[in-house]
């Protein structure tokens, strides 16, 4: 869930992709900071809500970037900016998850995995066209020996 004021501000900058991404990442970072503060105070419900808003903003940023042409240098720069932000957020999410009770930590772990997958997507977008992937290995069936008959001398 993205807050109405944040969505309005992001929509106002939708023509300028770098500015919109920077704004989105600032909002996401703010929610993550507030989640850390709530976690430190033991207010895990509010921390979960802030982590959910962080998740929504990262998801929105990935959807926004997916509309651009992947081979463009500008698009790769945007993905790199997103990847760097997500790289910094990973340890913060992990630290919160470790001090959070299990019933709330499950959701933080889910967002942590989502952020890791988002970072992977950003890296794949950045390097995807230059990486040579190994071909898939096809396993050959193991031949079964034919049993010998006892009728032979």
Named regions from a protein language model:
Residues 1-153:
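Long, charged/polar, soluble alpha-helical segments
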């Amino acid at each position: 869930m993205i807050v109405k004021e944040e969505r309005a501000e992001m929509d106002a900058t939708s023509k300028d992709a770098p500015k919109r991404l920077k704004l989105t990442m600032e909002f996401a970072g703010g929610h993550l900071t507030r989640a850390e503060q709530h976690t430190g105070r033991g207010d895990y419900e509010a921390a979960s809500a802030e982590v959910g808003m962080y998740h929504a903003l990262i998801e929105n940023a990935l959807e926004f970037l997916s509309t651009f042409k992947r081979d463009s240098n500008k698009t790769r720069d945007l993905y790199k900016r997103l990847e760097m932000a997500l790289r910094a957020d990973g340890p913060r999410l992990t630290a919160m998850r470790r001090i959070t009770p299990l019933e709330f930590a499950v959701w933080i772990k889910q967002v942590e995995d989502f952020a890791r997958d988002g970072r992977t997507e950003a890296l794949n977008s950045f390097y995807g066209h230059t990486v040579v992937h190994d071909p898939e290995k096809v396993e050959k069936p193991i031949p079964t020996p034919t049993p010998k008959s006892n009728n032979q001398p």
